[in-house]
C-alpha cells in the first residue's frame, strides 16, 4: 500500500509539473498579460479584457517580472515599511492571490527594473538611488549582493533583463550624459557595453528568446520616443518605432508584437515587431521635426505601415508589464535553451516531489499542528508545546497579543515581536489609554486638541482665570495687589484688576483699595445712554414732531378753498317819507343829511354801528324753543336771503 501510494504521489507531481509548463492557452490561470498600476496588479486575457486584480494591499507598485516555471509574479512596492520585493501566486483551491515577502527592505531602495533567473532562482534588480544592480535568492534570508556598481562612474541603472539561455544580464543606463546599453555574465564577469551612441535615455529592456534580439525603449529629447532592437551582441540595430507624446516605462514582447506602458495616457500600446526604419551611423540625419541628434538613413520601409494600437485603457498610471510567452514549451529544441529548459523542468519536478514526500511524512504532525496549535503555531512533538508565530501567545497560540491591547489606537507588532500602539489624535500612553487632556486644564477650563499631531493641546479658560492650564486665579492675584495698595498707594496694580478690586471693595472696603488710573475712561467701554443724552434725544424728538405739525397745518391752510364773503347794505334814516304810506325807516332811503349806510360783511362782527346782530323780537319769541342751529337763521330779520 505504501508503494502504491508513493507511485500515485509521484504521478500527481509529474502531472502538476506538466500543467505548470503548459503554454499560455492551457494554463489554469487563464491570463496572458499582467500590468502593475500604482495600487494593484491587473491581469488580462489575450483580448485585453480584465479577468482579475490582485495586490490591493500595496500602495506604490513599480517593477514587475514573471517566472513561468512556477507561475510566480515578483513585484516591488516603493512604500512598504518592511519588504522591498514580493511574490504573488494564485491559489487554485481558494481562487485568490497570495502575496508574500521575498526580499526584505534594507534601506531606502528605489527599484527601477526586475528580472528573474529560473535556473538559479535568483532575483536581479536595479536601484536608481544607490546606482547599483543587486541580486539575491528567492528562498532564504541571504543579504542582497551587488552585481554591478555604477555609482563611481555616475551611471543610473534602469531596466534589467536576464538572458536565461546564455546566462547573461542586460541593463539600460539612463544617465543622460553618457547613456548606454550593457551586459554582464550572471556570475559578475565580462562586463560589455553594446550600445553607447545615438541614444538619449534608455528605459525598459527585454530579451526576446524567440528571435534572439534585444528590445528597449529610448526616451528621446523633447516629446519623442523610440522602440529599438538589436542582436544580443549589439549588432544589426533597428528602429522599430519612433513617435511622440508618450512617456513609456517598460515593455514586453510576444511572438509578433511589442507592448509597452505609457504613463501619460494611462494605457498599454502595441506595435508589430517588424521594424520601420533601419539605423546606421554613416548616413545623413532624417529630415523631420525632432530635437534628438540620432543619425538616420533615408527611411527604408520594411513592411506595410503599422499604426500604433491602444490595446488597454487603465484607471491608474501604468508602470510594469509582463506577458506569458510559453517559453518552456517553445524553446525545448532550441540549441541555446534546450539544456536550460531541461534543467529547470528537472528542478521543478524534484522540488515538487520532495515537497510531496515531506508532506506525506509530516502528515500526522500537520494534523497535530492543526488540531493542537492554532493560528499557524508550530507543534513540537518532543515537548508537546506550540511555538507561536509573532503576534500570538498561549499554550495553543489561541490569544492574539493585539486583541484589546490598544484602548484608543491601532495595534501592530513591532520588530521585536511586541505589540505597539499607534494612538488616535488626543490620546497617549503605552496603550493609548490616557487622554492628552486628562488633568491638563484647571478651574473649569476646556481642553482643545488640534488636528495637527505635532501641536500640543491648549486650554480655553473661563472668566477670571488665565495661564497655559488656567491655573492663574485673577481674583486671588488681584486681591493681593489691592490689599497691598491699601498700605502702599503708590504701588502699581495691573489694569485688569480694577473691576475685581471694585467687587471686592463692596464687601470689604476696609482692607481693599480700588486702583485709580489716569484716563481710565478711555480704556473702559463708554456708556452711551447717559441722562444728558436721553434729555437731548427727547427734546429733539418733540421739536421734530411740532415742526411736522406746523408744516402740515400750513399746507392745509394753503390749499383749503376760501369761503365766499357775503355783503349786505342797510340804509337807516330818521324820518320816513310822508308821501308814502308804506315807507318805513328800513325801506326808505334817508336823506343826505339824515341817513347812514351799513355794509355788513359778517354777522359775527356787527360792532361797527352798535347795531345788534339778532332781531330782538324774534329772539324773544324763539328763545325758549329754538336750538343753536335755529339761532343762526335769525341773524337780522327781514333779510332778502337766507344767509345760511
Curated annotation (Swiss-Prot):
Region Disordered, annotated ranges: 280-301
SUPFAM superfamilies tied to this protein: EGF/Laminin (SSF57196), YWTD domain (SSF63825)
GO cellular component: plasma membrane
Biased composition (Acidic residues): 286-301
Subcellular location: Cell membrane
GO biological process, one term: positive regulation of circadian sleep/wake cycle, sleep
Gene3D superfamilies: Laminin, TolB, C-terminal domain
Domain spans labelled EGF-like: 398-430, 433-471
Superkingdom of the source species: Eukaryota
UniProt keyword annotation of Cell membrane present: yes
Glycosylation (residues): 82, 108, 175, 190, 313, 473, 508
Cytoplasmic side: 553-644
Residue stretches spanning the membrane: 532-552
Disulphide-bonded residues: 402-411, 406-421, 437-447, 441-459, 461-470
Family per similarity comment: Belongs to the cueball family.
Protein name according to UniProt: Protein cueball
Organism for this UniProt entry: Drosophila sechellia
Taxonomic classification: Eukaryota, Metazoa, Ecdysozoa, Arthropoda, Hexapoda
Amino acid at each position: 500500500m505504501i508503494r502504491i501510494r508513493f507511485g500515485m504521489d509521484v504521478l500527481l507531481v509529474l502531472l502538476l509539473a506538466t500543467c505548470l509548463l503548459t503554454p499560455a492557452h492551457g494554463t489554469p490561470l487563464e491570463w496572458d498579460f499582467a500590468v502593475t498600476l500604482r495600487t494593484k496588479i491587473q491581469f488580462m486575457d489575450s483580448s485585453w479584457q480584465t479577468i482579475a486584480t490582485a495586490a490591493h494591499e500595496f500602495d506604490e507598485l513599480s517593477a514587475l517580472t514573471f517566472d513561468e516555471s512556477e507561475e510566480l509574479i515578483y513585484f516591488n512596492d516603493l512604500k512598504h515599511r518592511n519588504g522591498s520585493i514580493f511574490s504573488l501566486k494564485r491559489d487554485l483551491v481558494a481562487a485568490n492571490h497570495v502575496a508574500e515577502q521575498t526580499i526584505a527592505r534594507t534601506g531606502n531602495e528605489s527599484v527601477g527594473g526586475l528580472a528573474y533567473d529560473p535556473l538559479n532562482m535568483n532575483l536581479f534588480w536595479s536601484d536608481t538611488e544607490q546606482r547599483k544592480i543587486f541580486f539575491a535568492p528567492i528562498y532564504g534570508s541571504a543579504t542582497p549582493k551587488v552585481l554591478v556598481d555604477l555609482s563611481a562612474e555616475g551611471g543610473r541603472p534602469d531596466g534589467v533583463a536576464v538572458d536565461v539561455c546564455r546566462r547573461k544580464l542586460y541593463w539600460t543606463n539612463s544617465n543622460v550624459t553618457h547613456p548606454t546599453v550593457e551586459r554582464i555574465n550572471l556570475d559578475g564577469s565580462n562586463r560589455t557595453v553594446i550600445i553607447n551612441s545615438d541614444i538619449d535615455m534608455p528605459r525598459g529592456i527585454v530579451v526576446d528568446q524567440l528571435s534572439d534580439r534585444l528590445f528597449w525603449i529610448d526616451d528621446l529629447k523633447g516629446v519623442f520616443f523610440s522602440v529599438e532592437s538589436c542582436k544580443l551582441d549589439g549588432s544589426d540595430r533597428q528602429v522599430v518605432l519612433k513617435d511622440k507624446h508618450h512617456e513609456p516605462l517598460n515593455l514586453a514582447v510576444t511572438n509578433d508584437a511589442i507592448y509597452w506602458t505609457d504613463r501619460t495616457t494611462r494605457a498599454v500600446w502595441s506595435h508589430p515587431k517588424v521594424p520601420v526604419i533601419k539605423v546606421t551611423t554613416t548616413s545623413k540625419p532624417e529630415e523631420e521635426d525632432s530635437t534628438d541628434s540620432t543619425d538616420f538613413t533615408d527611411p527604408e520601409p520594411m513592411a506595410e505601415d503599422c499604426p500604433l494600437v491602444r490595446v488597454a485603457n487603465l484607471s491608474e498610471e501604468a508602470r510594469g508589464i509582463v506577458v506569458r510567452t510559453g517559453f518552456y514549451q517553445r524553446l525545448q529544441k532550441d540549441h541555446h535553451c534546450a539544456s536550460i529548459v531541461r534543467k529547470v523542468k528537472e528542478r521543478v519536478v524534484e522540488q515538487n516531489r520532495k515537497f510531496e514526500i515531506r508532506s506525506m511524512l509530516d502528515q500526522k504532525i500537520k494534523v497535530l499542528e492543526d488540531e493542537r496549535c492554532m493560528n499557524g503555531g508550530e507543534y513540537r512533538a518532543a515537548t508537546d508545546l506550540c511555538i507561536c508565530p509573532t503576534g500570538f501567545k498561549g499554550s495553543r497560540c489561541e490569544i492574539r497579543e493585539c486583541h484589546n491591547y490598544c484602548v484608543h489606537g491601532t495595534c501592530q507588532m513591532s520588530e521585536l515581536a511586541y505589540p505597539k500602539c499607534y494612538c488616535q489624535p488626543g490620546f497617549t500612553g503605552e496603550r493609548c489609554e490616557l487622554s492628552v487632556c486628562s488633568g491638563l486644564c484647571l478651574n473649569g477650563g476646556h481642553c482643545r486638541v488640534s488636528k495637527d499631531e505635532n501641536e500640543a493641546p491648549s486650554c480655553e479658560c473661563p472668566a477670571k482665570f488665565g495661564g497655559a492650564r488656567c491655573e492663574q486665579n485673577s481674583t486671588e492675584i488681584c486681591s493681593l495687589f489691592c490689599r497691598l495698595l491699601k498700605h502702599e498707594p503708590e504701588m502699581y496694580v495691573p489694569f485688569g484688576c480694577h473691576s475685581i478690586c471694585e467687587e471686592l471693595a463692596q464687601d470689604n472696603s476696609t482692607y481693599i483699595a480700588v486702583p485709580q488710573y489716569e484716563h481710565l475712561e478711555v480704556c473702559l467701554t463708554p456708556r452711551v445712554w447717559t441722562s444728558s443724552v436721553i434729555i437731548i434725544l427727547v427734546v429733539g424728538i418733540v421739536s421734530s414732531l411740532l415742526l411736522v405739525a406746523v408744516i402740515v397745518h400750513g399746507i392745509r391752510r394753503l390749499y383749503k378753498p376760501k369761503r365766499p364773503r357775503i355783503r349786505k347794505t342797510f340804509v337807516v334814516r330818521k324820518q320816513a317819507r310822508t308821501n308814502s304810506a308804506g315807507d318805513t325807516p328800513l325801506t326808505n332811503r334817508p336823506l343826505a343829511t339824515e341817513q347812514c349806510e351799513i355794509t355788513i360783511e359778517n354777522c359775527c362782527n356787527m360792532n361797527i354801528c352798535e347795531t345788534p346782530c339778532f332781531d330782538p323780537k324774534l329772539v324773544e319769541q324763539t328763545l325758549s324753543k329754538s336750538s343753536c342751529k335755529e339761532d343762526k337763521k335769525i341773524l337780522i330779520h327781514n333779510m332778502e336771503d337766507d344767509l345760511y
